[in-house]
């Protein structure tokens, strides 16, 4: 079949989000033909070029989501901004089109400015939102010029009137003209996919299935492909756009009214994406809970874990060497969300109980002023808490805490970093899908983690969990494993078995291979051109008779109630191992999931 893969700020560009996952998906399903529709985030990303594409990628269409303020578009011809956006250039609307535009923006603004519902379902503004959203899409398709109109004085006046209207939220009512100008600019940027020239019978109209690699802007072309051509939409989210907006809000340059308007817009857009999608897959149940809160139907949700390459860690995982028995290892990007400050204070407690313990911190190369400042702060705290210690009068003092960069001569790769210790520690206060934990599980290492994001779901009962921002609890868990090598080995073996059964690339590809076939069989695209021969005459048996009848084969099937349980946790396994295997799988998961800490070590 022909798959339209929709991305935002990632594949096929050499840098960006979900790049590796998309590349593995495309390369792992060579029986399908892929058309790529990619939105870029910056001029720098476009300058980095594309990754090498496999032969079954037949077409690539790109468009920028960045504005001239972020960087001047380079090049003319097909790579220029105006050539890839059917925006009409300097086209101005006539009186009838101006009236249509004002009506659609008014409906959209009324929905966005309305008080957000505090329950789990979307507010009543969803109807107005879809009316304005699809109205603008049809206007852009017919007339172009939408990007100029959304930045016009008309848009600002409509937003100002909607924020003053009855039913608007208190925060929105305090918005100033500057806030409305800022929101109009952000709205134009997010709605830029409405003006693309992708919505023709030879473009998105020619694919059998649209697969959006994320929600938000990447899913907008899929919404329009379904509306204009009836193409089914599959949405995969490893993180929720609304959650990302909330996490980034404290560092944003916008005021509270603009942040509130953007949050409301993303909420309504997410609800519409989930409503129109034939199926929505979540990278973990933490994301799945966010999707349900944003209005997704639980019957349309499935959990498909992101596949990871286990081969690079096989040598460490199969080796009998358990690493440094007194060494704790932390691996990841050094940034405030990882809370290395709490880890250092926890290690101070560990050293009081275990004087021979060591802590090795392996970080990726630091990028940015914030990360550089944070690393310097962590080094200063480590020097204060753990001054260099000498074993004798004529030996050089050595600190029990070391900061090492992955890629150096001593630690050329991640596998060597995980092999350096017997216990892997994760101290984050914010975490989505904990990739470093899965990698350590592939290496057969016992773990101590904070209970954030999808941590408990990933480790099941194969590691210890402590509350975030609690150095004493984190230290107690580390001490327990350092003093019990048998338990450490048992948990490491169970962790490796769990990771190999749930988090490999093969599991991920098998899940999407089945999903593609399921969606096409339940909702095939019927095109008039396919029903006619070369002479324009009706083609016999172009569609089976069953396609015209209502029956169970024409309705989407609910997700399976049961999910496969890992073999090491199935019936007949060793009682102790089964007790530590985690909790009962959640309905609708394609891979077994742990919905709670269970009654094992966690």
Q: PLM features: residue spans?
A:
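Short acidic alpha-helix that forms the nucleotide-activated donor recognition element
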Residues: 271-275, 394-421, 442, 472-476
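Conserved donor-binding/catalytic core segment of Leloir-type glycosyltransferases
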Residues: 312-351, 359-365
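Nucleotide-activated donor-binding/catalytic signature segment of Leloir-type glycosyltransferases, i.e.
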Residues: 372-409
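Aromatic "clamp/platform" in nucleotide-sugar-dependent glycosyltransferases that forms part
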Residues: 429
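Short hydrophobic beta-strand element within catalytic cores of glycosyltransferases
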Residues: 444-449
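Short acidic/histidine- and often glycine-rich active-site loop of Leloir-type glycosyltransferases
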Residues: 452-465
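Conserved acidic donor-binding segment of nucleotide-sugar-dependent glycosyltransferases
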Residues: 464-471, 480-486
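A short, well-ordered alpha-helix in the C-terminal region of glycosyltransferases
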Residues: 473, 487-502, 508-518, 528-532
């Amino acid at each position: 079949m022909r798959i339209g893969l929709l991305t935002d700020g990632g594949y096929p560009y050499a840098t960006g989000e979900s790049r590796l996952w998309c590349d593995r998906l495309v390369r792992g399903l060579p029986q399908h033909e892929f058309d790529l529709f990619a939105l870029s985030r910056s001029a720098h990303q476009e300058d980095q070029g594309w990754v090498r594409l496999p032969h079954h990628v037949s077409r690539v269409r790109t468009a920028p989501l960045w504005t001239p303020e972020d960087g001047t578009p380079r090049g003319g011809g097909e790579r220029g901004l105006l050539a890839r956006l059917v925006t009409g250039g300097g086209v101005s609307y006539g009186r009838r089109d101006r009236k249509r535009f004002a009506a659609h923006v008014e409906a959209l603004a009324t929905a966005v400015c309305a008080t957000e519902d505090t329950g789990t379902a979307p507010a009543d503004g969803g109807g107005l939102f879809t009316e304005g959203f699809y109205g603008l899409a049809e206007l852009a398709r017919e007339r172009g010029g939408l990007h100029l109109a959304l930045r016009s004085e008309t848009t600002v006046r409509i937003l100002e009137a909607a924020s003053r209207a009855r039913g608007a939220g208190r925060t929105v009512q305090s918005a100033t003209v500057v806030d409305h100008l800022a929101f109009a600019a952000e709205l134009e940027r997010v709605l830029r996919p409405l003006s693309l020239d992708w919505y023709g019978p030879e473009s998105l109209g020619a694919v059998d299935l649209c697969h959006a690699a994320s929600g938000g802007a990447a899913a907008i072309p899929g919404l329009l492909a379904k509306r204009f051509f009836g193409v089914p939409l599959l949405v995969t989210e490893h993180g929720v756009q609304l959650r990302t907006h909330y996490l980034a809000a404290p560092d944003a340059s916008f005021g509270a009214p603009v942040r509130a308007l953007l949050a409301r817009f993303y909420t309504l857009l997410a609800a519409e994406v989930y409503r129109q999608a034939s199926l929505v897959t979540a990278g973990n149940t933490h994301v799945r809970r966010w999707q349900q809160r944003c209005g997704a139907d639980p019957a349309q949700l499935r959990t498909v874990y992101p596949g990871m390459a286990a081969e690079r860690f096989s040598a460490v995982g199969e080796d009998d060497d358990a690493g440094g028995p007194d060494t704790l290892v932390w691996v990841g990007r050094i940034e405030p969300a990882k809370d290395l400050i709490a880890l250092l204070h926890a290690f101070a407690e560990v050293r009081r109980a275990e004087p021979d313990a060591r802590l090795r911190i392996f970080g990726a190369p630091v990028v940015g002023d914030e990360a550089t400042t944070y690393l310097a702060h962590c080094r200063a705290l480590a020097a204060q808490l753990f001054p260099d210690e000498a074993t004798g009068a004529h030996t050089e003092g050595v600190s029990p805490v070391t900061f090492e960069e992955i890629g150096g001569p001593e630690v050329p790769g991640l596998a060597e970093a995980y092999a350096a210790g017997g216990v892997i520690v994760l101290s984050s206060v914010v975490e989505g899908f904990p990739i470093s934990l899965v990698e350590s599980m592939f290496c057969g290492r016992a773990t101590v983690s904070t209970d954030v994001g999808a941590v408990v779901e990933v480790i099941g009962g194969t590691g210890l969990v402590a509350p975030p921002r609690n150095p004493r609890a984190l230290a107690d868990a580390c001490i327990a494993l350092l003093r019990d090598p048998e338990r450490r080995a048992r948990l490491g073996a169970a962790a490796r078995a769990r990771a190999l059964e749930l988090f490999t690339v093969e599991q991920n590809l098998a899940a999407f291979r089945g999903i593609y076939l399921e969606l096409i069989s339940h909702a095939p695209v019927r095109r008039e051109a396919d029903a006619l021969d070369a002479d324009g005459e009706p083609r016999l048996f172009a569609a089976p008779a069953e396609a015209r009848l209502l029956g169970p084969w024409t309705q989407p099937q609910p997700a399976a109630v049961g999910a496969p349980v890992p073999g090491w946790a199935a019936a007949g396994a060793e009682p102790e191992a089964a007790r530590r295997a985690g909790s009962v799988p959640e309905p609708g998961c394609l891979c077994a999931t742990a919905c709670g800490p269970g009654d094992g070590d966690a």
